[in-house]
Amino acid sequence: MIDYTFPVIITNSREVLCKELKNVHYKNIQKLIQNNDNENLCIYFEAVIEELCVTKQSLNYIDKFIILLALRMVSVSGVLEIHTKSEIKNTLEIGVISKTILENFFPNTKTVRSDEYNIKVDVGYPYTISNKNVLFDKIHTIEIDGTKVALNLISQEERDEILSLLPASISKDILKEIKQTKEYKQIKLFTYFYEEGKKADYYFSFDSTKNFDLLKMIFSDNLKNCYYYEYVCVSKLHISLYDYLYYMTPVESILQIKTLSKEIKEQNDAQKAAQNTNKQPTPGLGAPR
């Protein structure tokens, strides 16, 4: 079976092809969110991008954020609902959120050089999804004697080994540069009502730690819904559990269930109409004149 792919525009007007988010991914995300397992949720988001992004490119955190938004739009829903404590529902278009982030993106890469050791290091936005501020996560590339390595394209063990070989003097310069760029630009992402007639602005920072809660909010759903959809598709529609988990998307599951509900309603309405048609007049003397 050939997987359906769709294009996603990321930073610097680049394009990547992605496969759809399946029920197995969505269910696992809901489990991690419900258990508040932030560390493993970050790891799983990274694994989902690695699996579903067909085009292999050097991706920073913003690219990955945009890809996750696209997966949410295509495979789940293009609408984000925010419910406030005062029970006000705000409806937002995820496509508009993604567009706003891309329009306000600006390259933030800076270079640290050491002519003594012939080393050049590029630092900038973090390249992994994280709920913690990991300083060395902001090192993009290291070039030593003309050989350049992109750290986000190698394993953690290889990164640690390369970083351990850097002279202490340049390591200090790198840390200094990273700390100077700690405060990233903030943009107004959207406005929402938190009480009747009262609005607030939600700001987006180009820093993975500050936006992790937003990412969780965008993907949050009721885990019971996932189990309910699974039950209906498997027991009522006779779709195998494997096919449901690994070949169907959340939005496809809901469409199938809605179709089933419509058919059941039509059958019930037809039965009621038939019963009403076949009803005999009640025996009696009739109405008085």
What is each residue range found by the language model?
Residues M1-K272:
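An amphipathic, hydrophobic-aromatic interaction surface with interspersed Lys/Arg
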Residues K272-R289:
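Short acidic DE-rich linear segments
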